[in-house]
A protein has these predicted regions:
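Flexible, processing/modification-adjacent segments and terminal tails
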Residues: 33-43, 47-53, 95-168, 188-191, ...
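One face of beta-strands
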Residues: 54-58, 69, 78-80, 168-170, ...
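A generic structural motif
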Residues: 59-63, 81-83, 101-105, 159-161, ...
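N-terminal cleavable signal peptides for secretion/export
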Residues: 30-75, 216
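Short, exposed beta-strand/loop patches in secreted or surface proteins that constitute
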Residues: 68-74, 90-93, 139-145, 200-202
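Bacterial N-terminal signal peptides
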Residues: 16-27
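Gly/Pro-enriched, hydrophobic low-complexity segments
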Residues: 151-245
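N-terminal secretory signal peptides that target proteins for export/translocation
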Residues: 1-12
């Protein structure tokens, strides 16, 4: 008989709102007495994001410019609203996959894989990063325990399905207490680091922990040197209680 993997338990209480890769992660505490099943860790993160509501304002800051935005999270739909030019980028988190589309000039259109490697607002973030496809890649591996800025985390690795991504492998660090994504790294097909997203600081708003600053670093795979360093910063938020589980 094959034993069942340890269950991931989602407990009430500490519910941080963390925008990671503009990956906005809203999660309840994720704990397990033993190392949990990696697929359960990712599933818990996806499910919790789809149950939260929040309104955030901030900016995407590059070396050359700042792009203010409003970020709305509502029951599985995450909307990034930019101005000058007006652009809405909408992420819908499903149970088996995510969808990404754009609203410009009153028109809605799908953001197809052909655009996934293009930068968002001339930053180091690409449309694929916003789509969060790596959270759905099959057969994740648990590499063990680690820490990110003193926070205990599970470290996982996912292999991209063939010819579907600019990345070959993604590694993620998931906070053991909150279930939030603390760091994400994307590697090319040769195992060379291309991009790193890391939560630098958090802040408390209306009794909830939310992102204050996330750093986005883009690397030259051949030299391993940083070629750009951008920041996603949150300066205000209203966080609503999560929707009840179905």
């Amino acid at each position: 008989m094959i034993p069942h993997p340890p269950q991931v338990r989602i407990a009430p209480g500490f519910r941080p709102v963390l925008a990671v890769l503009c990956l906005l992660g809203v999660s309840s505490a994720l704990t397990a007495e033993d190392a949990p099943d990696p697929a359960a860790i990712l599933n818990a993160a996806r499910m919790n994001q789809s149950r939260q509501s929040a309104e955030l304002t901030g900016q995407l800051r590059t070396a050359a410019d700042k792009a203010p935005f409003r970020l709305t999270v509502d029951n599985g739909k995450i909307t990034y609203q930019f101005q000058d030019p007006d652009q809405g980028i909408v992420l819908v988190l499903g149970t088996k996959d995510s969808e990404l589309f754009e609203r410009m000039g009153g028109r809605k259109s799908d953001i197809t894989p052909a655009r996934y490697d293009r930068p968002v607002r001339q930053s180091g973030i690409t449309y694929e990063d916003l789509a969060m496809k790596f959270l759905y890649w099959p057969n994740p591996k648990l590499l063990g325990s680690d820490s990110v800025r003193t926070r205990a985390a599970w470290k996982l690795e996912m292999q991209a399905p063939r010819a579907t991504s600019q990345y070959g492998v993604a590694r993620v660090w998931v906070d053991k207490q909150s279930g939030a994504l603390l760091r994400v790294e994307g590697f090319d097909d040769s195992g060379r680091l291309r991009r790193r997203f890391e939560v630098v600081s958090a802040q408390k708003v209306d009794g909830e922990w939310i992102l204050k600053q996330m750093r986005v670093e883009t690397f030259d795979p051949s030299t391993r040197k940083v070629v750009s360093r951008d920041y996603l910063e949150i300066d205000g938020a209203t966080v609503a209680a999560p929707s009840p589980a179905p």
